[in-house]
Amino acid sequence: MKRRELILSAVAATGAGSGTNRVDALGLITPAPRYVPNAGTIYPFQARTDRIARLSVCTRPFRKQGPRIELEKIAGKNVVHNYGHGGSGWSLSWGSAMAVTSLVRTTNVREVAVVGCGALGLTAAVYMIRNGLKVKIYTRERAPDVRSFNASAGWTPASRVGTVEDCDPVRWEELCRNSFRMFQGLMGLPGDPLQWVDSYSLSDIPFDQAQAQRKADAAAAPVHFGTFDDRTKDLIPGNEDMAPGTHPFPTPYVQRTSQLIYNLPAYMSWLEHEFLINGGQIEYIDLQGPHDFGRIKETTIVNSTGYGARALMSDESIIPVRGQLGHLVPQHEISYALRYQNASLLPRHDELVVQRGTSDMDGYDNPSVAPDRAESEEVIQKLANIFARMTAPA
């Protein structure tokens, strides 16, 4: 028996790869699962546009200088700003919380207010309450209505976090490493709010050529986004080249690594529960301008309003970067991420996420939050083409 036949027979015997290609009502083919040595079974994505449960659009709060974490006197209050993290809000949330807490302690208070209940506000509140401070969150929205709930939810600490010319890489590295350390202490919690998954990158040309082209395009772009990942290469497993015949994908070049993802409904629920069970309070407020900080009784306030800070603070250093996600019905058997050209797939317990990403300039200075269904359908069709051409490993 040939090795190819032996693998498929073994998979069929266990039930992991049983079944044949299926054609759905829309005429799209879902191939049978494929077994990959040392990786388990690659279950195919049901790439169907009718599985879109919802679309979401979020405006990332990009600042050329990077996150604004600094103390300012406003309306008689000590206001510690904590916003402007671009596409790195979740990834840098714990490191930012530590930096914020250090500034809060310089004000010599025990009671602190946090404005905002998204990634940065909720995480800062949890960290401060764990460190002996009494914290109340003031917010207009809570999950699932905060912008942070619509993040793609992968570990992306350098995503549109600043420009090469203006962002401090040493400061970024400190935030990144502190966040990563905290995240590792949260692995294995009930419900898997955080988890590691295999991540596959597919390419039609050698990866070094693809990377050279991306660098050339980035250099020619009007905005030079910071690429600081080289400073923290030790945190994430490196890319592993997969030889032809060891994977089921149809492209000539495939790499595999590991990616940290956040299952946001479970993770945000855990953060809020952690905050409330330790004595935190949440109160509704709608602030229209900096003068409204005077309405808050606490004398030290952490301003974690994300993109909302652009209007609240009249801070035009915040530039919107539009990003759209397609949220699909979950496939719990899929436990890997995949990227091909400008299409990506990310697995979460609550859903599958698809996203278009041509370059860092995609969506730059675009404040529109109107969803474009055709954009997500295009991503699904591109992924459908990949999965329709899957083959069994040799």
Residue ranges of model-derived segments:
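Flavin (FAD/FMN) cofactor-binding and adjacent substrate-gating region
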Residues: I7-S9, T49, L55-G76, S148-N150, ...
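A conserved short coil-to-beta-strand element within the FAD-binding core of flavoproteins
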Residues: Q281-R295
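N-terminal secretory signal peptides and thylakoid transit peptides that target proteins
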Residues: M1-T14
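Beta1/beta-strand and adjacent pyrophosphate-binding region of the FAD-binding site
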Residues: R110-G118
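Short beta-strand to alpha-helix junction loop
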Residues: S88-L92, C167-N178, Q255-W270, A370-A374
